[in-house]
Amino acid sequence: ILGKTSPVKFFKAIMPAALNAFGTCSSSATIPISKQCVEEELGVSNKITSITIPLGATVNMDAVSILMSFMIMFFANACSINVSISMMIIILLANVLLSVGTPGIPGGAIASFAALATMAGLPAGVMGVYISINTLCDMGATCVNVIGDLAACVVLKEKIKLDE
């Protein structure tokens, strides 16, 4: 809606970048393919993609943040740990800050999750379970993060009119 591009056209154009993100679990490794997809298929200016995509690969870790929040609450519930509302708010704020600092590489969220798990008072054994399922979750989360970066490019294309 904001980017004035049909969702079908958008997803068809970005499919190579989304699949690469899913397969590599790396926002950073997907930067060249992401730029190519939105520049060639969707007509976004290089001036926009040169800033938006690398910045998004670095700080746009929204899916990782959501995933870590759910995982903390899941493990707390599984371990019969009562997490108060005030602790949830603290974990949420720390999660937002940690997700911005999470590197866009495979397994980059493991250290952030360890910090959050410690804050929530989870036992150390939770880390083994988290690490064992992290790759499966990371594939989807990275794909969502990259799609968000590319959607931002399309929206900026419509909102910022550049003279080429």
Model-predicted regions and their roles:
Residues 16-99, 153, 164:
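Helix-loop-helix junctions within the multi-pass membrane cores of secondary transporters/permeases
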Residues 69-164:
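Transmembrane alpha-helical segments and their short flanking loops
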Residues 1-10:
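Signature of multi-pass transmembrane helix bundles
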Residues 6-7, 24, 102-103:
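A short, ordered amphipathic alpha-helix with a cationic face
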Residues 1-2, 41, 78, 119:
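Alpha-helical structural context
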Residues 12-15, 19, 23, 137, ...:
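Membrane-interacting alpha-helical segments
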